[in-house]
Regions:
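Surface-exposed, low-hydrophobicity beta-strand/loop segments enriched in small/polar/acidic residues
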Residues: 1-140
Length: 140
């Protein structure tokens, strides 16, 4: 789960894929013009932002076409707290990592470079900058 710690963001209301459960704090991307959860292979330039509220199968509007709230960074260095699969260490600071899924950083992979570690909070939690959207740094 990603939670903004500091920096400027804006809230955008975007269309979501109907009948799709998503968790608050998930990175989201578009598929056929509707939001879906980002995956471990989603490129940074395709990721829109962070979903603000959980979408559950028990929601009254779960199967309804609707707009949902997404938090989108409006400046480059917004800091986010995120869960990490395991093993985050001080040597990871400054390095780019990928996602395990839409909610979790994979510190052992750096194919897509979705986040950059700025602080280690524990072996399973850190602070990161997102490398997403149209300004995402391309993998060298």
């Amino acid at each position: 789960m990603l939670i903004r710690k500091q920096g400027k963001t804006k809230l955008m209301w975007l269309p979501v894929t109907t009948s799709t459960a998503l968790s608050a704090g998930a990175l989201v991307t578009f598929s056929s013009g509707k939001l879906i959860a980002a995956t471990s292979t989603t490129v940074g330039s395709d990721i829109v932002g962070v979903l603000r509220h959980t979408i559950a199968a028990t929601d009254a509007d779960y199967a309804t076409a609707r707009l949902v709230e997404v938090e989108v960074p409006v400046e480059k260095n917004v800091v986010w707290t995120a869960d990490v699969t395991s093993g985050l260490v001080a040597a990871d600071i400054g390095l780019y990592q990928d996602l395990t899924d839409s909610l979790t950083v994979n510190r052992g992979a750096s194919t897509y470079d979705i986040v950059q570690c700025t602080k280690v909070l524990s072996a399973t939690k850190g602070e990161f900058l997102l490398n997403i959207g149209v300004d995402a740094r391309a993998k060298a």
